[in-house]
């Protein structure tokens, strides 16, 4: 199992390009199953989760061709299998997203219960109840969701009892080919859902309320193939900005967007960062200053994203002052605190709240990543520590960050990968 070794004392300084969004690319790849012809999806990041989703499409008989720039042609007209097997689904939660498209287009789907990061309970019951409201017949058998809609899906009004990104995406994709009008209430509003909706609209879907918590979808008979470019990764953007702020450095990020990261940028400015936004660029400068502690509570978009909590917690560990971080989305997502404390951080857990008193320096230690974003926070902590930090189980980080060591090396960080 590969590990990362980070030499402490690095200060971020340089310019890099931001990759396409994994959390947008995965549902868009699932949406290709809805098309009546080939789709061309561009700006996909080269990540394990994307590779797994493409492997899942291939095992269903879908034609997949990839060029050297990670522009993928997907031809769903050759599909022969309607099962997402455990062997592929077990490593990636987003594989559940093929359920809605398969059911809408082909009237049947067998999908194994998904895997992914171990960060708490993320039940799929909202997906299933929504599909049942649209006329699907669903049973759970032997770890598989077995769904069918012999008479096709019908439009329905469905109120999601909690805000769920995956549930919104699955039901949105199911609704675009359903007969009649579907209204999804309490829908998630994340930019990745907007990106998916815009891709579906480019394919011929009729969707109103994009970017709001009420989506109205008028079903159509067929969707066409199209060419679509995935949005930039806002969490990768935020991670490199936090790394620069924590180390007192400077960074310029290209091919990204500031409008999808407002809550994060506001907190970075509160920490003392000077931020300059250009056309497709974000620049952050700390001028060698130690960041100030910032308190926040995670919540669904447009509030502070749970996927940035761990990185800010690492920055707060060496910040000037005391902060509180409240995690309201996933119950186990403060798990990296124990590893940060092993590196000399002063963090106290009270339920879903971390009380962080900043220390001047962390000390290197061997640490273990528990999920995707926790692993990113430990890499940032390694930059801030005295000595060499070894981060184990970095397969988590490879699920969400394209070429992380190469990008950090380009920014002046002394980091290397060693085979396990």
Swiss-Prot record:
Phosphoenolpyruvate binds at residues 22-23. GO terms for biological process: cell division; cell wall organization; peptidoglycan biosynthetic process; regulation of cell shape; UDP-N-acetylgalactosamine biosynthetic process. The active site is at 117 (proton donor). Its main location: cytoplasm. The modification 2-(S-cysteinyl)pyruvic acid O-phosphothioketal is found at residue 117. Disulfide bonds: none annotated. GO terms for cellular component: cytoplasm. It catalyses: phosphoenolpyruvate + UDP-N-acetyl-alpha-D-glucosamine = UDP-N-acetyl-3-O-(1-carboxyvinyl)-alpha-D-glucosamine + phosphate. It comes from the Bacteria. Its EC number is 2.5.1.7. GO terms for molecular function: UDP-N-acetylglucosamine 1-carboxyvinyltransferase activity. It is found in: Cytoplasm. It is an enzyme of class 2 (transferase). Belongs to the EPSP synthase family. MurA subfamily. Cell wall formation. Adds enolpyruvyl to UDP-N-acetylglucosamine. This is UDP-N-acetylglucosamine 1-carboxyvinyltransferase. It comes from Saccharophagus degradans (strain 2-40 / ATCC 43961 / DSM 17024). The gene is murA.
């Amino acid at each position: 199992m590969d590990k990362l070794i980070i030499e402490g004392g690095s200060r971020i300084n340089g310019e890099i390009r931001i990759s396409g969004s994994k959390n947008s690319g995965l549902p868009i790849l699932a949406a290709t199953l809805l098309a009546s012809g080939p789709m061309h999806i561009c700006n996909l990041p080269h990540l394990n989760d994307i590779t797994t989703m493409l492997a899942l499409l291939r095992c269903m008989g879908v034609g997949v061709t990839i060029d050297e720039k990670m522009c993928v042609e997907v031809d769903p007209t050759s599909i022969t299998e309607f099962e997402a097997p455990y062997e592929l689904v077990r490593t990636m939660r987003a594989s559940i997203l093929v359920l809605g498209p398969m059911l809408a287009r082909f009237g049947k789907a067998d999908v194994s219960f998904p895997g992914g990061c171990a960060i708490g309970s993320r039940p799929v019951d909202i997906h299933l109840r929504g599909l049942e409201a649209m006329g699907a017949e669903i049973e759970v058998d032997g770890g598989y969701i077995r769904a069918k809609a012999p008479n096709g899906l019908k439009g329905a009004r469905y109120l999601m009892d909690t805000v769920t990104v995956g549930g919104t995406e699955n039901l949105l994709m199911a609704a675009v080919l359903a007969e009649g009008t579907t209204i999804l209430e309490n829908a998630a509003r994340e930019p990745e859902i907007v990106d998916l909706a815009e891709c579906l609209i480019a394919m011929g879907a009729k969707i109103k309320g994009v970017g709001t918590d009420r989506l109205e979808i008028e079903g159509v008979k067929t969707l066409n193939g199209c060419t679509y470019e995935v949005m930039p990764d806002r969490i990768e953007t935020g991670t490199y900005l936090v790394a620069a702020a924590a180390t007192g450095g400077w960074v310029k990020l290209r091919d990204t967007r500031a409008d999808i990261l407002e809550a994060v940028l506001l907190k970075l400015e509160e920490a003392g960062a000077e931020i300059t936004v250009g056309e497709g660029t974000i620049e952050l400068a700390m001028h060698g200053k130690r960041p100030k502690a910032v308190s926040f509570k995670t919540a669904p978009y447009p509030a502070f994203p749970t996927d940035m909590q761990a990185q800010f917690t690492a920055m707060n560990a060496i910040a000037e002052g005391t902060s509180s971080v409240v995690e309201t989305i996933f119950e186990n997502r403060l798990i990296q605190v124990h590893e940060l404390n092993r590196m000399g951080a002063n963090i106290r857990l009270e339920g879903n709240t971390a009380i962080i008193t900043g220390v001047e320096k962390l000390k290197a230690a061997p640490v273990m990543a528990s999920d995707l974003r926790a692993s990113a926070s430990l890499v940032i902590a390694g930059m801030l520590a005295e000595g060499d930090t070894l981060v184990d189980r970095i397969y988590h980080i490879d699920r969400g960050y394209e070429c992380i060591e190469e990008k950090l090396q380009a920014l002046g960080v002394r980091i290397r990968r060693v085979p396990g």
